[in-house]
Structures are given as C-alpha cells and as structure tokens.
Amino acid sequence: PERLESIINNTKYPVQFIFAGKAHPRDNEGKELIKQLFQFASKAEVRDKIVFLEDYDMHLARHLLQGADAWLNTPRRPLEACGTSGIKAAINGVLNVSILDGWWCEGYSKERGWRIGNGEEYEDLGYQDTVESQALYNALENEVIPCFYERKNGNRPGNWLKKMKASMKMAMEYFCSLRMVSDYEKQYYIPAARRWEELLAEEAEEAEEAEEH
C-alpha cells in the first residue's frame, strides 16, 4: 500500500485508478479483495484518486473503454481465459498494462503496451503475487506514467500516441472475426475439402483402403 500511495499522491505525475468488477457469490477470496480495496479507497489521502464502481456490466464497460488511458489487467497466471475486455480496450485506443496471460501473450509487444512480469509461474501463489505486484509498480513508475507525461512537442504525448495507433492496428487486424474465419478457411476447411476429393477420387479406392486398415 505504501508504494501505491506514493504513486497516486505524486503531484508531478497525478494518477487516478478506477476499479470495476464483480465477484462470484462463491468467490470468497474475490469478495475479500473487493472489501480491502473499498476500505483502502475510503482513506482520506487517496479518496479522490481511487474509484471503485459497483455493478460492473457492459453498459459501464462502454464508458470505461471510452474514457480510460490505460487498461490494467492483473489475473493470476495462468487462469485468464482470454481477456476480451483488453481487446476491446486496444480497439478503442486504450493501452494495455497486463500480466502475460490470455490474449496478451499474443498481442503484447513493447510498441503496443506494457507487460507485467515475464510470464513466470510459481507454486507459491503468495510469492507469485509479490513478484507481480513489484513488477507492476516498476512498470507504472518507470515506463507507463512517464510515457504518458512525456510531452516533447507541444502538449501531445508523442510516444503514447504511437503506441495507441500500433495497438489499435494490431487488435483490429488480428483479433477480429474476419481473421478468425480466414484462418479456419485456409487451415481447416480448404485442406479438409481437398482431402475429401482425394479420398473420393478413382472410385474412392483410398477411402476403402483406409477403412480396411
């Protein structure tokens, strides 16, 4: 908490964290984490710099995607199924700061956003959380926040804007239904159709031989 307070109380580079989400009714650990976050956000010295939004849904997500500068995703690797919210963020020009898990394993490059850690996993989950939390703080302090406030030409963060454009281009080109269907066509449907024609050629002799074996 001390290092987090140092980040959000930095008057030179002000930062605001917005948290939103729901815990499954049986996810006691998740509910306890939300409780701790809410209690921390209620402290007078951080009250206006940490915001927790209740009842997260697609309507709320839409506003977050339109207004955030960076999208922070911290699943406990390797439990992230995909992370589609991060893909939506990238399409909207929001830069990802994420654990290397789910889609970010494929989508990450230093030109498009930031990674938390190096994708390592540990049997001791408490130790893993410690390693990744320190990696997150390092990324925020040394890379993410300075990049946003770097304004060499006028009032525009040049490097940040370059990352935004690269991230949007990557997400729209690669993480889309058009690419998915194209891959299915080239890698599965067309080869399967050609193989079907081969099996049926010459009165299906090859198919009969395969059946015999």
Positions of PLM-derived features:
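Catalytic binding pocket for nucleotide-activated donors in carbohydrate/polymer assembly enzymes
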Residues: Y13-V15, L65-R179, D183-P191, L199
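Short, flexible/disordered secondary-structure transition segments
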Residues: D48, R195-L199
